[in-house]
């Protein structure tokens, strides 16, 4: 039961985690770009 639940959650969380880390890195890049101006 738990294994089946995890096997369904983990593959769904991977793209969300990648997208979230990409957005955070982009926002930090934009913030640093604004500080340079």
Swiss-Prot record:
Question: How does it sit in the bilayer?
Answer: Single-pass membrane protein
Is Transmembrane there in the keyword field? yes
Q: Which GO terms describe its cellular component?
A: cytochrome b6f complex; plastid membrane; thylakoid membrane
Q: Name one GO biological process term.
A: cytochrome complex assembly
User: Which branch of life, at top level?
Assistant: Eukaryota
Residues annotated as coiled-coil are none
Keyword annotations for this protein, in alphabetical order, are: Electron transport, Membrane, Plastid, Transmembrane, Transmembrane helix, Transport
- Compartments it resides in: Plastid membrane
Q: Which GO terms describe its molecular function?
A: electron transporter, transferring electrons within cytochrome b6/f complex of photosystem II activity
**Sequence intervals crossing the membrane:** 5-25
HAMAP family under this entry? Answer: Cytb6_f_PetG
> What family is this?
Belongs to the PetG family.
Instruction: Note the subunit structure.
Output: The 4 large subunits of the cytochrome b6-f complex are cytochrome b6, subunit IV (17 kDa polypeptide, PetD), cytochrome f and the Rieske protein, while the 4 small subunits are PetG, PetL, PetM and PetN. The complex functions as a dimer.
* Protein role: Component of the cytochrome b6-f complex, which mediates electron transfer between photosystem II (PSII) and photosystem I (PSI), cyclic electron flow around PSI, and state transitions. PetG is required for either the stability or assembly of the cytochrome b6-f complex.
The molecule here is called Cytochrome b6-f complex subunit 5
Which organism encodes this protein? Aneura mirabilis (Parasitic liverwort)
């Amino acid at each position: 039961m738990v294994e089946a639940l995890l096997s369904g959650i983990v593959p769904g969380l991977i793209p969300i985690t990648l997208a979230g880390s990409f957005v955070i890195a982009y926002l930090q890049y934009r913030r640093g770009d604004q500080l340079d101006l």
